[in-house]
């Protein structure tokens, strides 16, 4: 939301270019702090429980959703997973930057455009990523986090480009 004194407020429409830039930053953060993130998740049973519960809730929410609005609520669980992941960096500035990026802001634009299968693929990628973290397979974690963000980038930027053409 953009607020300008004496002019009002409006919702800033995210462009495919802006989303692409955000994914560049996400990839940078998620991979630069990867060793620390993996180590901290592996030694924190509370965080492990939170992540596993999040993944299970996410998959369940996708499976039982009967409307687009219920599918849209799954994005909150997606965002929560990534917040838990980046919080394991234990770097306050990185966590602040992640929140400021508002990288899940695109959700409002893509509701109804992404299929249940695409949404489920993302949740299942979270599970694979988490399994690799628990196994301490850092090269695999790097590959999976990169793949996950690139898949999301492709899906979201494709949808945003289509929406840009129709407006």
Model-based region annotation:
Residues 12, 35, 95, 114, ...:
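Nucleotide phosphate-binding site architecture
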Residues 119-120:
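Short helix-capping and inter-helix turn/linker motifs at the boundaries of alpha-helical repeat units
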Residues 1-39, 43, 158-167:
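Short linear motifs at protein or domain termini
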Residues 139-167:
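C-terminal effector-binding regulatory domain of bacterial HTH transcription factors
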Residues 36, 84, 88, 155:
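Short alpha-helical functional segments enriched in proximate histidine and acidic residues
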Residues 37, 89, 112-113, 160:
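Helix-loop junctions at the membrane-solvent interface of multi-pass transporters
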Residues 136:
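Residue-level signal for the nucleotide or nucleotide-sugar donor/cofactor binding architecture
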Residues 17, 22, 26, 45-110, ...:
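Conserved amphipathic alpha-helical segments that form helical-bundle/coiled-coil interaction surfaces
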């Amino acid at each position: 939301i953009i607020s300008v004194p004496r002019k009002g407020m409006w919702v800033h429409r995210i462009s495919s270019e802006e989303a692409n830039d955000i994914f560049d930053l996400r990839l940078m953060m998620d991979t630069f702090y990867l060793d620390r993130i993996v180590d901290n998740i592996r030694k924190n049973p509370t965080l492990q429980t939170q992540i596993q519960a999040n993944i299970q809730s996410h998959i369940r929410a996708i499976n039982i959703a009967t409307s687009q609005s219920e599918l849209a609520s799954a994005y909150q669980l997606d965002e929560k997973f990534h917040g838990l992941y980046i919080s394991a960096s234990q770097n306050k500035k990185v966590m602040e930057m992640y929140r400021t990026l508002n990288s899940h802001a695109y959700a409002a634009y893509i509701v109804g455009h992404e299929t249940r299968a695409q949404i489920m693929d993302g949740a299942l990628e979270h599970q694979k990523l988490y399994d690799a973290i628990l196994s301490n397979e850092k090269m695999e974690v790097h590959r999976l986090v990169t793949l996950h963000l690139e898949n999301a980038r492709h899906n979201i930027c494709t949808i945003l480009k289509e929406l840009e053409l129709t407006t």
